[in-house]
Amino acid sequence: MFVEMQGAGLKTRHYNDMSLQSEYDVWHQRIHDADPSYGDVFSPWYQLVSEYIGGIAGLRILEVACGRGGFVRQLARAGACVTGCDFSSAALHAARTKLPAAGLRFPATLIQGDAQNLPFASDSFDVVVSCETIEHLPDVKSAIRGMHRVTRPGGRLLLTTPNYANFMGLYEIYSLFRHPAHEDDQPFDRRQWFPQILKWVRQAGWKILRTDGAVHQFPLFPGRNPIRWKALDSKRAIRKMLSPLAYTYFVMAQKRDREARDMRNER
């Protein structure tokens, strides 16, 4: 059982894997029909990951909650051995239909699975990517621990999530009293502060290497579209300084090798 905020109050909703999966299948189909480009590789969170991921040829990369597979295809075109995992069969069906014509250097694998219980062996991947996903999971800590488990020692995590402590986040909190709380009508949504997420990342055993942010938006009046200052996203130094105001937060972390973890545990 999970509690969500909807409208002006709390509403209790009972979820199990099948009911939530069914809702996400419907959501993906509706979003795809309304906007086929939704969540494509030009989304700001994928742009952040692309900026930091570095050379990936030959690397084993997992994208958790890959959706319709746009970023999976981009990574595979760059020479990575990519696995995409998503909870929704509808999203994976859409992803599979686009793979044959994608011109991939290496085949990509698509697997249905739960981000909170990843169906992969330990130490399977060099890099794990998760974009705008953990805020839609009932158990975020289990998901972060699972991403750590399937990453090899020395491997990296690149993760993005909305920043609810900025101007737009405050505006969204205000809007809770006027509209349902779900972002894009997603079936499940939790608003968590980035410092808490960083704490969970560290507790799972990751070493944080870098944080950043993107999409600086400033609401003017309720009901009006916010102004986005794209110039603030173009320079990394400026973006870093203003990251507390960003709409999307980014963290890159590394799984400690076993020797380093053993020394740390002995202290």
Predicted regions and their residues:
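Intrinsic disorder/low-complexity segments
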Residues: 260-263, 267
